[in-house]
Amino acid sequence: MQKDLHPKAVPCKIIYQGQVVMETMSTRPEIHVDVWSGVHPFWTGEERFLDTEGRVDKFNKRFGDSYRRGSKK
């Protein structure tokens, strides 16, 4: 078997918006992330509501009853 085939694991800092949010082991000394669990709405419990009623109205306005009846061939 070959020696030193695998890269060495070193302490790694996970960086979010210029701040170290976590330390772990990796082959890279730093990893910059755009989103992490500390700010993601799913993990923080923050709810965001989409304007689904507006989407339905837009769909009905565009297609009307023709979608429900099916296409006539």
Curated annotation (Swiss-Prot):
One of its GO terms (biological process) is translation. PROSITE patterns: RIBOSOMAL_L31. Keywords: Ribonucleoprotein, Ribosomal protein, RNA-binding, rRNA-binding, tRNA-binding. Gene3D superfamilies: Ribosomal protein L31. NCBIfam families: L31, PRK00528.1. Part of the 50S ribosomal subunit. Contacts protein L9. This is Large ribosomal subunit protein bL31. It comes from Deinococcus radiodurans (strain ATCC 13939 / DSM 20539 / JCM 16871 / CCUG 27074 / LMG 4051 / NBRC 15346 / NCIMB 9279 / VKM B-1422 / R1). The gene is rpmE.
